[in-house]
């Protein structure tokens, strides 16, 4: 047979509707001869083939092709192969040489190597549009007529290459396709993108850029504080905190005097025991839930801790914080009742959060549970143990403590707590008296008070009245408010009052002005509104869907899944489980329940604080850039933010930032409004409106539901009103009024003055039955009018409040980009006029510490099962460390390097032996003990820890590596605690710096008879380091 060997064929196929090349073999450079010579095989069907299954079988006959058709197929295959090679060569050259191929050009800026590529006829083929078989739809390609066209047209946002793109002329490397520009950057013109793309402007919101945790050029959220500013801030802090520090010290001195009286000791001889708690533990009183910062009393048997305030109350005859759990009886009657109908009681337990939302949308309310209430409607006590919370804040809830169960009956009944005539408090568990213990070095707070008083006597403190009581720049020459000032906003109409106007500067005014103007208003407890803070940022999008894309994780070991979240339904204030994408769809387009009422959902603290910083580093950086008055608000190094003064290894409260995402409507609905109910924050706060979206108009049938709501309110809430027709008209009219909402308005704020709180609480207690809360049930009782967070005052109640008590709040609209600074102690409520995304951050200013202490006293008197009971701020601990930090800044003393976090005694980690050497090595001469006896005492304590560790080990484990680690950890714990709590009277000089380590070694040598390999190895390590 005279045929040429066939080496390969190039085939052009369409797979799944997409054109592409699939090469089976390398194409032969020889000319293939497809003319079949005449053979005898044609007659009998060709030669037989052998196979495993079919044995000898004949191949299928194929129709013969004429010579011209075969030749055309070979030419086409060779043409396509050459086309692919040309495209690859062109792409490599273009990627190497930054040249632009103009349409129709074959010279000029085009590289020589690709001049042979025909841009005209085959321009589509170069970009990947390969000729396909007849009848097949060709693949969509990029329009080659775009100026700056290149073969590489992959969009930076979506990573697709089959779309029309805009190429950046600044970096000449990034491209954005038109669909992405229309979807994610609708406010940016395509011509502007071509001049300078979003990547170059640091506003790109693709997932990769949003998760970029490196510093970007031109964006710096750090606050640079000069030494002079540090000194001035320290003087201001000491002047503000000295009275509070004295109060803390007096409280401790009084308890020490009681201790001296009980045991017949002199005051100087009182030595409270070390509580052996670690810096990253959070210890609070088991009775009043107040944070314990230093001195407290403890039961050795049941591990009960009691703060000094509770000790004083018990000795006075009654523990005021010992109260019974409160019960709120809110009954679930279904969605029909929530919209004015009778409804029927649903007795099934709320097992699934997602059932409630499904019921509202699908319409099966009677046979499914209604969801989980946000509060505690049945009044049952928490399932959580009532004992103290020790350990890290991020401990898993499944971790079981080693402590024995504690009998908590004595927490509820004050009569069980008693003290004898001497002042000894006996624990109700029957184990004996409570022991006085400490967390800080003995006498440290008294020493701080003495140092601050000496500094004040030397005239080194900043005189507070001179800085804030000068004439405000907002006032005119007659010392009256200049109402024509552009930095003032009228927010109230109180007669005879000069605080109807709020200070509202722009972000640029705040940056150019000093802090005195702000302090003038802030020290009076007035909120401040800083306008257009987003102008100081790069312009990164805060649209919730953009943030959702950055946080979205289908499956990730570290981050987990964030597809489903728990939201709050603003109609009945119950928690529901909702898909995050569906939630954001309702955020922009609006959603309605099966009865036609707006379904308003609210996300609080989404994403969680840890995810916000990890998955949204760009947004976290952007938020820090937008913060106004950074000396007060910066969460890392704000010199006047007391929250940053805590030691690095200390457990810090969660101060944010936190996001609040919710849909909203301009019209006040009366029920189901997107509101944050009346409350007081535990500290100062700054709230920035970062994004708004207007929801389309409501459905027409909503008016009928409003009328049913008003009839139900008249029947259940206002049954005692004489003129019911007039009241009915008032209710309907109040819900028909639409707030005057401008384009950039987002939220309506009502902030009450501190001096108006007694009248506000009196009004709520008087009219509390006119409000609804869980399941739209009337509020039956009031524990605390503000801390219950059960009330939102509508425009009707705001009007009635002014008529009856003569008070009114500051009321204003928060616009897009406005930052509202709320002083602690000012009750406030918020209603969203549009769908809003707000980001909030807490901080503690020196001026408002007294209000933080006042709120702490109120929290401790709430019932044990009240959600606001626990003191999460720990302001007294903050005061002590802030004073210490300020004194060190004034004296020029550098802050000590943070110790490695000590682990819990029950489960110490490995590598602790190295921590011992480092802790001893880093000690300054002033921190060494001054006597041989003190050294001997510490050494004996360390060796005793070794002895105990060895005795507790089984014989088989004495020489194991695990045993060595556990004993070393015990050594570290004992040594660290002894070194940490060295009193000021036992300091030693520089010459005695090297005494400690040799004494420890000698003590080990005397006890070497144990013969443990662990002890020998540790002694050798100590001798080799020779500190």
Curated annotation (Swiss-Prot):
Annotated residues for binding of Zn(2+) 3: 285, 288, 302, 310
Induction record: Promoted by the RNA-binding protein ASI1 via its association with an intronic heterochromatic repeat element and epigenetic regulation.
Sequence motif Nuclear localization signal 1, location on chain: 48-55
GO molecular function list: histone H3K9 demethylase activity; histone H3K9me/H3K9me2 demethylase activity; zinc ion binding
Amino acid composition bias (Basic residues), ranges on this chain: 48-63
Stretches with biased composition (Basic and acidic residues): 8-17, 64-74, 346-370, 379-410, 889-903, 919-932, 948-965, 975-996
Zinc fingers typed B box-type, residue spans: 280-310
Cell compartment(s), UniProt: Nucleus
Entries under InterPro entries matching the protein: JHDM2-like, JmjC_dom
Residues where Zn(2+) 1 binds: 155, 158, 177, 180
Binding site for Fe cation: 679, 681, 828
Domain (JmjC) ranges: 635-860
Cofactor note: Binds 1 Fe(2+) ion per subunit.
Zinc finger (RING-type): 155-201
Chain's role: Histone demethylase that demethylates 'Lys-9' (H3K9me) of histone H3 with a specific activity for H3K9me2 and H3K9me1. No activity on H3K9me3, H3K4me3/2/1, H3K27me3/2/1 and H3K36me3/2/1. Counteracts the DNA methylation of endogenous genes. Involved in the control of several developmental processes by protecting genes from silencing. Demethylates H3K9me2 in the promoter regions of RDR2 and DCL3 and mediates the repression of ectopic non-CpG methylation at RDR2, DCL3 and APC13 loci. Protects also a large number of transcribed genes from non-CpG methylation.
Protein's name in the database: Lysine-specific demethylase JMJ25
